[in-house]
UniProtKB/Swiss-Prot annotation:
UniProt function note: Redox regulated molecular chaperone. Protects both thermally unfolding and oxidatively damaged proteins from irreversible aggregation. Plays an important role in the bacterial defense system toward oxidative stress.
Name of protein: 33 kDa chaperonin
Provenance organism: Staphylococcus epidermidis (strain ATCC 35984 / DSM 28319 / BCRC 17069 / CCUG 31568 / BM 3577 / RP62A)
S-S bonds: 238-240, 271-274
Post-translation changes: Under oxidizing conditions two disulfide bonds are formed involving the reactive cysteines. Under reducing conditions zinc is bound to the reactive cysteines and the protein is inactive.
Gene that this polypeptide is encoded by: hslO
Similarity comment: Belongs to the HSP33 family.
Gene3D superfamilies (UniProt xref): Hsp33 domain, HSP33 redox switch-like
Amino acid sequence: MTHDYIVRGLAYGGEIRAYAAITTESVQEAQTRHYTWPTASAAMGRTMTATVMMGAMLKGNQKLTVTVDGKGPIGRIIADADAQGNVRAYVDHPQTHFPLNDQGKLDVRRAVGTDGSIQVVKDVGMKDYFSGASPIVSGELGDDFTYYYATSEQTPSSVGLGVLVNPDNSIKAAGGFIIQVMPGATDETVTKLEEAISQMQPVSKLIEQGLTPEGILNEILGEGNVQILNSTSAQFECNCSHEKFLNAIKGLGEAEIHSMIKEDHGAEAVCHFCGNKYQYSESELEDLLETMK
């Protein structure tokens, strides 16, 4: 099985910027950790795929967080990624599932809802943040990220996202693409791109056929039209730690920590993103109080 990775490329003489990713293993890791049911897995996996490709557009230590909140039964989907291909995600209600929709596909729109927004916060370093948001227009997510780029970042784009789930709830395949029109692109190039996208198979079909990220871009943009610039491995990775949660407990204040010691004789923290649990003993909390004096 091919490991997850993202490719970045140019097409049509540099007038098109393109990203594609296979994210099957990363989405599987998230599914296992959160025990998501199929519709939730598809929604979470599509969001992870978009987020990890958006991360590939960053540099150095920059990172971003994407929050999808369509006010649907799944609640919020939160994913973050960095420039190194690390991605993690969780959903408020992982056991969300519905019968297949009219097209015989997982009903992601029903789970996500259509009465909310996508918010993107980019940490670009030096305590500098870029924040953008756009309304959810479809709930299927690919169209919603396309709309986000057009309205919030003024970049005409096409975003395709697909997740296939096996009958046993495991992830069969996951992946997607982001194709963007660069400033100065000719009308001819834009027309060619629109035609190519209108004629392409759904992303889920491309990944089901076992296409690589390079194969996805070649399939959409045509063999020989794509110049691959680089590739980055992608993986589910959580940077939580015992120390980070201890700092978070410190932020609750002395009164709350005294209460933890007196009533609970310790504390437990659970990471939303990966499900890891961290235990803090009475003595550890008492030591923490000492450092706060």
